[in-house]
Amino acid sequence: MASQHSRRSREAPRPEMSIGRYTRLDEIGRGSFATVYQGVHTKSKTYVAIKSVNLSKLNKKLKENLSSEIDILKGLHHPHIVALIDCHESTSHIHLVMEYCALGDLSLFIKRRDTLGSHKYTRDMIAKYPNPPGGSLNEVVTRHFLKQLSSALKFLRDRNLIHRDIKPQNLLLCPSPSSYRSGHAQVMPYKGSDDSYEPTTGLESLPMLKIADFGFARSLPATSLAETLCGSPLYMAPEILRYEKYDAKADLWSVGTVLYEMVVGRPPFRATNHVELLRKIEKGEDRIRFPEDNPASDDIKKLIRGLLKRNPVERLNFPEFFSNNVINDPIPGLLADDAPGPPQSPRPRQLVGKAEESPYDTGPEDKLAYPPGQRPVTTHPKSGTPPTATDMRRMGSADRPAPAISKEQQPGGTPPQRPGPVSLATAPGRQELIDRNATTAAMDRQRHRNTYAGAPKASDSTIRAQEARDRAAQEVAFERDYVVVEKRAVEVNAFADELAHSPRLQGGLSRPGQTGAGSRRTTTQGLPTVSPSSPHANAAKAMQVVSGRARADSTHQRQHSYERRYGQSPTSATSAISKALNMASGRLFGMGFSPPLAITKGGRSPPLAYNPFPAYPPVHASLLITGDGSKPNATGDEDCKAVQEIEECATRSDVVFGFAEVKYKQLIPLAPSASTDPSARPMDTNVEPDSADSDDGLTVDAIVTLSEEALVLYVKALSLLAKSMDIAGAWWSRKNREEVYGESPTKDSMSAVAGTRINYVVQWVRSRFNEVIEKAEFVRLKLIEGQRRLPPDHPSHPDNHSISSTAGSSSTADVVVSPGVTAERLMYDRALEMSRAAAINELTGEDLANCEITYVTAIRMLEAVLEDDGMRSMPGSNIERQSSSQGGEKVVLDELQVEDRQVVVKLVSSMRGRLASVRKKVAVLAKRSSAPTPTAGSAGKTPTSNISPVTYATGVTPPR
């Protein structure tokens, strides 16, 4: 391990850098967003680890994780948890000064088990407890590490914390405490507290284990559940892989995998992705196998099998784990000098220990003088400085810090009190008060850390009164968000009317047929125009669209506390209403972002007969090349980009809408006559649908399932439509600004075509937006009615919904969507099915034209999965190229792990390759069919079966 550090320093020598009271030395580790350096305290000459996080590589979610990690570490002081010593911020980096662990992590320790005998810090350990053959560690060492890991976990559970990323890479090792006392260890680490290197359990002659990396940690009481997919796949609990809600037992599964790896030398389950890993876990059926020659004791094997239970209910719980004889009994097989002596009374754990004279602290100014949670954060106030970990949020009335108090005033073990209400229009809903995620919990602690220090413990009645005030404040904030949702529908229609009646667009920029397009909008409500030969013609005609706008008085309902949370999306460049739409829609419909990799439940996937809807009525004029083939000018190029971005986003929304229509039409089967079709009549949103007339033999469970799936898909389509309108609004604002300041260039054919096309698309988006809102409201009422008809013991029955979440609600009913039902998950599964069907047809050479359409639709659906609801777009699209040039920020969606995103991106890339291959085959067939000398009656004709029947607008084809 020392050789690794020296090799890295030789490969990448860096000049020393001063960071506060510390000097940054050589690099010792590197991750995706941070680099870890060895550092030294300038006065005491003791060593620290400095984790330098590059702020330019962090998006909003990662900054929240960093803030959560800092906030949690400030309040954790335990010998087996890596302590945060200090925190400094510059304009480009946040430097976390942490305890230095000279032996690296446990994964490296296991990997280099055969060379530990030659290492100065571990040679004595190997001499006393040699590792057995086969890749495992000596059981004495394994039990020693397990005892220390369990001590840290008990400390976390006492504080209702769950780590969620327990793995060997996050378990760091320090030289044995005895080596420090004897002076054998030459590298003396800086102490985060007086007992940082005094183990609470285990052997003092063996290396000391510490848990690190609390980026995914969060507060989770014993009775609460979480549902965010996070952690490392190989060590991730199966309930997380199944996208089910989970509790703190997920950490115990990770402990079981780590223990298995120490005993065997490899993880119990290995796979290349989440789906394959879950398949192997399920296939194993809780039969954990060990090599025949493995020397592990029966007690260890029994403990591992108890921890690696697929069903969390059958898994050991924390009291059983902490009381296990492997944890509590003395370690068998110890040598005489390691045998335990007479028991000593445990040292009381104080929030702040009194610093003692030691080689770690050489002067009084270097001793810890700050209570936990009040460590100094050195900031450099400069213009343009990115937000720090302590101000990555809006400041409310409760955010004003109180003066810091001395450690004598800090009551030991005083629990934090609930913060006061924050009067913000965008304040989070009730869910953040009941089932907080890691970010919200961290921000709440950051808000009131200094306000409760030194205050007497509040009585239960005071806490209940405070909770009631909090709920009232959050209700008011939510109502404000709800009003904004309806305002968004008004703004969409107002902007479309503005473009439709703009003298600048109508006076010289309109083209023949523009008026006809407007009239078609009022009659067909934006149904896509297809040619008679298109395979989608019947599908397009089959669905009559409801006329009318969304009702301003329609009653939207709040969601319950255990529903999925829809994270905030970045604020649009032209309108903050889009963000409010997405946030309030999430609370209203229970929509949350879930990583798309999942095992499809029975009955969730739509039938393979689904045909993708084509793009909005195609425009045959090309913007990418002018009439003479020359490159367009700068202004024209900007117009081209705007058109392409709007069309791409609208096309993705159209694909999602088509998928939702499949669910909708299963709920409301089409009658032979459109006049009798319930979906063709204007819907009265004040009257719930008559299930007896429209169910058409569907079971109640099927109605609820279809309604939930249609609802989340319609909400996803709404968010994409809103994004298209925001892009168009940005283009229109720029045009108006140029006109005001006299910067508008001379009108040319390019600008005329761009204005016409954008106006054309905006009118289509407007009518589709109104249509989706209308249908989403109908599906919502259908869902409420279906849930009422469920058996009383069904989890989705209204009587089984959370009561606390509806306290103070004046609404008639709440909309609750089952956990795991998300648009992204449905879209991912559907795209996989479509691509597989297309691949089979491609291999057999059947219906290649339809293969092309299917591939394009599957690609668009996956692009919508990866689509952020802010002003960022897909890899390879103009929006992302623009954002990357501005800040280089990597798009990582809320709750979508980097690994999952990479899997989806690779799948899209593979589909594009297959699409290119199909198009080549279609072109070859078309060329062959036109090779014979044409007759007089068939000159110039080519078989339509070999040509794509849909003409896509420029910018709609997948990015190459």
Swiss-Prot record:
Root EC class: transferase
InterPro entries from the UniProt entry: Atg1-like, ATG1-like_MIT2, Atg1-like_tMIT, Kinase-like_dom_sf, Prot_kinase_dom, Protein_kinase_ATP_BS, Ser/Thr_kinase_AS
Composition skew (Low complexity), residue ranges: 801-815
Name of the protein: Serine/threonine-protein kinase atg1
Residues bound to ATP: I28, G29, R30, G31, S32, F33, A34, T35, V36, K51
Ranges for domain Protein kinase: 22-327
GO BP: any one term: response to starvation
Residue stretches spanning the membrane: none
Bias (Basic and acidic residues) ranges: 550-566, 789-800
SUPFAM superfamilies documented for this protein: Protein kinase-like (PK-like)
Catalytic activity entry: L-seryl-[protein] + ATP = O-phospho-L-seryl-[protein] + ADP + H(+); L-threonyl-[protein] + ATP = O-phospho-L-threonyl-[protein] + ADP + H(+)
Tree of life domain: Eukaryota
Pfam families given in the database record: ATG1-like_MIT1 (PF12063), ATG1-like_MIT2 (PF21127), Pkinase (PF00069)
Mode of membrane association: Peripheral membrane protein
Active site: D165
Protein family per UniProt: Belongs to the protein kinase superfamily. Ser/Thr protein kinase family. APG1/unc-51/ULK1 subfamily.
Subunit description: Homodimer. Forms a ternary complex with ATG13 and ATG17.
Cited function: Serine/threonine protein kinase involved in the cytoplasm to vacuole transport (Cvt) and found to be essential in autophagy, where it is required for the formation of autophagosomes. Involved in the clearance of protein aggregates which cannot be efficiently cleared by the proteasome. Required for selective autophagic degradation of the nucleus (nucleophagy) as well as for mitophagy which contributes to regulate mitochondrial quantity and quality by eliminating the mitochondria to a basal level to fulfill cellular energy requirements and preventing excess ROS production.
Comp. bias regions, Polar residues: 376-388, 520-536, 930-951
Organism ancestry: Eukaryota, Fungi, Dikarya, Ascomycota, Pezizomycotina
